[in-house]
Each structure stands twice: as C-alpha cells, then as structure tokens.
Regions:
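C-terminus-biased signal that marks the final domain/tail of proteins
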Residues: 1-15, 129-131, 137-138, 147, ...
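A contiguous strand-loop segment
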Residues: 1-95, 128, 326
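Hydrophobic residues embedded in beta-strands of well-ordered beta-sheets
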Residues: 14, 75, 149-152, 160-161, ...
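Short, surface-exposed beta-strand-loop junctions and turns on beta-sheet-rich folds
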Residues: 22-24, 82-84, 159-161, 292-296
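Catalytic cofactor-binding cores of redox enzymes
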Residues: 123-161
Length: 326
C-alpha cells in the first residue's frame, strides 16, 4: 500500500522516494505535462496549469497521477489511507472542488512551495467521487516536499485538507501520522551499533554480532512495520559528497520495504511493489525503477518538455538487463 520518505543531502538535494504497491495492475506510464496545459477537472471547468511537471500516469481513468515533481521542485506522492480519509458529499461554494486523485495534479500544477501550498489548500474541497475503473472512492493521503527541504503530510477530513509538518519525514498508510510517531517509542532501543556482551551470573552472554542492535526491527509488510523500518533506515543513512551514492541509498531503503510478488495476496491477486521512485527537487529529476527491470530510468524536467503543446508519454524498458562478463 506504498511507502514514502524524504531525504536531504549536504549538497542541498532534496529527495522524495516512494514505492507504488498495489494489486490492480496500473501499467503506469511516466508522463511530462507542459506548463500552461489545459486540464479538464471532473468537477470544475477546464483550467490552464501554471506549472509543468513529470509523474507516473496511472491507467485508472483519465490522466490520474500517483506522484510527480513540478518545475518549482515541489514533489508529491499519494498513499492509501483506508478507514481514515473522509471526503465531502457536496460541493463547497468558493472552493476548488475535485476528485481525490486530482489533488496531485492541482498541487503540481498550481503550487511552487510548501508555504504556497499551505496558503492555497485552505480553499480546496475533496469530493466523494468514485473511480469507475477501480470501482471505489480511493482513500488517499499525501507526502509532499519542496526545494527548501520542507516535508508535510496532507490528510482529507470531510473533504477539507489538513497539512501536518512531518518531522519524521516518512509516510505509509493508516493509522494517522501521530499514531505512527507515538509507536516509534516501542523501538527506541534500535541501533546500528552492536549490543554489548553481558555477564549473567558467571556466564558471559555474547552479543549476536555487529547486527545485534537491529534485533527487533519489524520485518513484515504492514503499514506500521514499514513505517518503523523506513524511519530506522532513513534516519541512519550516511551523507555522501557523491550524489549518486545518496540516490542509490534512497533506492536501497525502498528495497527494504518493497513487496515481492507472492508475499502478499489480496482476494486471490498478488499485491506487490509495481515500481520504485526517487524525485530530486533540486535538479527536477525523476528516477523510476519498475518491478521487472534492474535499471533505473531518469527523466529530466527540462524546457523542451515544459514548452511542448501536449503531454509527453515516455516509454520505459520493463525487461531484465544482464551484462555478460566472459
């Protein structure tokens, strides 16, 4: 059901990383949307988007994005929030009314920073609109970061959006962020350092090696376990002057919470990580790694993409690449 985190480096690169976990095959296509693109919202007149962006276009209706980064460095991903997300049953006068999945397009198309978001989101109303392809009203919440390094979570309550400063810089699924943060108290003993040997009576009990400090780190795929595991790994990531190392470390954390096919089954269908993604707010770069490939693909949000007349759909190789050495 998706894991996300942000990570900031000494060179002022601000990353937002996520897994896209789902049962329904999205067959997502990386798509660049130019600035001033005319977008038809479901519940409002068509509008020109102020900013261009790149994200993965999910095949669950007309232009639905699960994540993206815009030309100002604002990056966002959505995550299921089952049992917690609540939407409005009626339009609100004077508000921008939209379907749950359209919030990402609104954020990327109209906001330039977290501060800008906090101001504009006060007049957004999320409606209880069903996605006809999925046959549900998607229960969503969001993690967002910007070029200044701020990270927030956004939760819908009766259609209105609550913006929360996310100091842990991790988001999974239900329950609410505050519950996850409080739950971290149960894991305060975790450490990258090995535990010390202890004398019990006359018996010297030796530590179980250099990994002993991680004994008790949750290993399952529930929302609560993934939150703890991601928080621990993200918090202890080393800083490198080589930005390619920082980028790869983000993908390594995603590996630790990615769900392989067969590990989780929902109603007879496999629920797995369909792709991993890291977005760089400083360079406006979008790095994606689909499940069936070992390659990372980069899309640079440049002026060529931003000044086109229409969307650009970008093909990604989904095959395994092996380099033979003899």
């Amino acid at each position: 059901m998706c894991t996300g985190f942000s990570f900031f480096t000494q060179q002022q690169h601000h990353y937002l990383a996520r897994t896209m976990d789902f049962t329904f095959e999205f067959n997502g296509v990386p798509t660049a949307v130019p600035r001033n693109f005319e977008y038809q919202f479901d519940l409002e007149p068509s509008m020109k988007l102020t900013y261009g962006f790149v994200g993965t276009n999910l095949k669950v209706g007309r232009y639905r994005f699960g994540d993206g980064i815009n030309e100002c460095g604002v990056a966002i991903s959505n995550h299921y929030f089952t049992g917690e997300a609540s939407y409005s049953k009626h339009k609100r006068y004077g508000y921008f009314n939209m379907a749950p999945e359209e919030f990402i397009i609104w954020v990327l198309g109209f906001t330039k920073s977290i501060q800008d978001l906090k101001h504009k989101v006060k007049k957004v109303n999320i409606m209880n609109e069903k996605n006809e392809t999925l046959n549900i009203v998607p229960p969503l919440h969001f993690i967002i970061t910007d070029r200044e390094g701020h990270t927030v979570s956004v939760e819908p309550h009766n259609g209105l959006l609550i913006v929360k400063d996310n100091h842990v810089k991790v988001l999974t699924n239900a329950p609410k962020l505050e519950w996850h943060v409080e739950n971290l108290r149960n894991y305060a003993f975790l450490s990258p350092e090995k535990s010390t040997n202890q004398l019990v009576g006359k018996v010297l009990v030796r530590s179980m090696g250099c990994e002993a400090g991680t004994n008790g780190l949750p290993g399952g795929y529930t929302s609560t376990e993934r939150f703890v595991r991601t928080t621990y790994l993200r918090h202890h990531l080393p800083q490198s002057h080589d930005e390619s190392v920082n980028l790869m470390n983000c993908f390594k954390v995603l590996d630790a919470v990615s769900i392989p096919q067969g590990a989780v089954v929902d109603a007879g269908e496999t629920h797995y990580t369909q792709y991993q993604l890291v977005m760089d707010s400083k360079d406006r770069a979008y790095y994606i790694k689909p499940y069936f490939t070992n390659q990372i693909f980069k899309i640079q949000l440049n002026e060529q993409l931003l000044t086109k007349k229409d969307m650009t759909f970008i093909d990604v190789n989904h095959q395994l690449t092996i380099t033979q050495l003899n």
